[in-house]
Amino acid sequence: RDFCLSRGLGDVYKRQGSLIRPEATGYGNVYFLLQMLKTRNIDIKDKVVCVSGSGNVAQYTVEKLISLGAKVVTMSDSDGYIYDPDGIDREKLDYIMELKNLYRGRIREYAEQYGCKYVQGARPWGEKCDIAMPSATQNELNGDDAKTLLANGCFAVSEGANMPSTPEAIDAFLEAKILYAPGKAANAGGVSVSGLEMTQNAQKLSWSSEEVDQKLQSIMENIHEQCVKYGKQEDGYVNYVKGANVAGFMKVAKA
């Protein structure tokens, strides 16, 4: 089953380029999250996750989380968010993909379909969760949102969108010493798979989606290793912001 192909999104990628590029950013973010959780011996299974957004990145973030046994309770769009305490399962995600990718519908229709809570004009960060994965837009998570997440017991934040957390939110996460992955590290999957495509095209290679997925996992593990190498503090806490910045600088310096 190749859901993205059935939605008409993947034909281009099937013909030219990597088979799983539409999934790359979302999958890659989850792979980075898994590496972070491993540093604290935390299993993702049954963890409650708040995801924002309902576009490409959010959809594939949720798809991968479901396959790993996590419980995703929120998704959102520019009008508001849904909160489903039973968790978004494969069937419900298929509904969202069809709603968004084919019909350009609104997320509130999910609440009508499945009888769950819909909150107009708000973001999902007030809901209780173990992990938050902002995957919608820039500056969608502010200092107050961060404090609410922390007060509700959130111990990991991994960014799928570009710069979704404001500087105040980032400061709050680092001060609380939770696992916090900035987008420049966690959402690098899309860029990475584009790089794999160039390699494939240049060398006239053809990789299966499984091979590309394996390479994506390895790339995200490598990025995580670099972040730990340059971001680990004396007290053992890994500052992934510093780690990503220094790792990026070292890469440029060596180039």
Where do the protein language model's features map onto the residues?
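Rossmann-like adenosine-cofactor binding region
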Residues: 80-180, 185
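Conserved structured core elements
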Residues: 23, 27, 43-47, 51, ...
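Glycine-rich phosphate/diphosphate-binding loop of Rossmann-like nucleotide-binding domains
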Residues: 15-23, 27-128
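Single conserved hydrophobic/aromatic residue that forms the stacking wall/gate
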Residues: 2-9, 13
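Surface-exposed loop/turn and secondary-structure junction residues enriched for glycine/proline
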Residues: 16-18, 22, 47, 85-86, ...
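Hydrophobic alpha-helical scaffolding
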Residues: 19-23, 51-55, 65, 86, ...
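Alpha-helical scaffold segments in soluble metabolic enzymes
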Residues: 28-35, 39, 60, 64, ...
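Adenosine-phosphate binding glycine-rich loop
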Residues: 150-255
